[in-house]
Regions:
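Conserved class I S-adenosyl-L-methionine
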Residues: 1-44, 58, 62, 79-82, 142-190, ...
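Class I SAM-dependent methyltransferase SAM/SAH-binding core
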Residues: 48-52, 56-103
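A short SAM/SAH-binding and catalytic strip from SAM-dependent methyltransferases
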Residues: 112-126
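A short glycine-rich, Lys/Arg-flanked "PGG" loop and its adjoining helix->strand segment in the class I
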Residues: 127-142
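C-terminal lobe and adjacent flexible extensions of AdoMet/dcAdoMet transferase-like proteins
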Residues: 211-263
Length: 263
């Protein structure tokens, strides 16, 4: 499966994804992943950045409001069209473009930093995407990204429950089994069932790597590893959204920051 085919899947996913996420049903993003991502993000005021796999622009807009001058790309025309419409309504100076992460049309050392929020694990030829990110970042600049946690998002797993039926752990199987474009189908569980029953489920091609493969790939490309985060919901979130309890048992996400060394 190549990036063009992946783009077609995301074009088909985009309408329902945009509708549900903007209604607040992407709870893991809004309550856990994005808050941790931006807490970890360095000061970016007046820096030029690239958002790789921006989707409809939710995290791009948060980044821009922190003072960065942003270019944002996605393989999906539908996502980019929606992001551009939002930019027209509420201008933040973001330039949105439909582009592939594996062939970035930008100059070497063009950006002070790059981010990728929950996109790299959905991109075929991940090594090319990370190599391209390295190429366009200036020496001394950073690359921060979030992915599904490679230790727990595997092809086969089961929850462990106690006598009361409460989840207490996770059994992970087939950790080393590769997914190379296998389609995962789901929809946001926080959305009302009477709404999602009428919707097409998301069909998402997955491209998995083990934890060591991710880290070794970054090192091979030339990045210096800098900081990691495995986000989980804080107590206040759990009081208001107890259904997020699962995220206190295992980390659903991994956030990594690495830096392009100054030669």
């Amino acid at each position: 499966m190549d990036d063009k085919e992946v783009g077609r899947y995301w074009d088909e996913n985009a309408e329902n994804w945009i509708k549900l996420s903007r209604l607040g049903y992407d709870r893991c993003r809004d309550l856990i992943n994005s808050p941790a991502f931006f807490k970890m993000l360095p000061d970016i005021k007046n820096l030029k950045g690239l958002d790789i796999g921006c989707g409809e622009g939710y995290n791009t807009r948060i980044t821009a409001k922190k003072g960065a001058k942003l270019v944002a790309i996605d393989i999906s025309d539908v996502f980019i069209s929606s992001a551009k419409e939002t930019e027209l309504q509420d201008p933040l100076g973001i330039i949105y473009e439909t582009e592939s992460a594996i062939t970035l049309p930008y100059l070497e050392n063009e950006f002070d930093f790059a981010i990728a929020t929950m996109s790299l694990m959905d991109i075929p030829e991940t090594e090319k995407a990370i190599t391209e990110a390295f190429r366009v970042i200036k020496p001394g600049g950073f690359f921060q990204f979030s992915i599904t946690h490679p230790c727990f998002f595997v092809s086969k797993w089961n929850w462990v429950r106690n006598e009361e039926g409460i989840k207490t752990g996770l059994i992970v199987e087939e950790y080393f089994t590769k997914q190379e474009g296998q389609i995962e189908e789901w929809i946001f569980g926080a959305a009302p069932k009477d709404m999602t029953d009428k919707m097409r489920k998301f069909k998402i091609p997955r491209f998995t790597k083990t934890l060591s493969e991710w880290l070794n790939l970054l090192i091979k490309v030339g990045f210096v590893l800098e900081e990691f985060c495995e986000p989980y919901p804080e107590d206040e979130i759990l009081k208001n959204f107890p259904e997020e309890y699962d995220s206190t048992i295992i980390p659903y996400f991994l956030i990594i920051r690495c830096r392009k060394p100054i030669k």
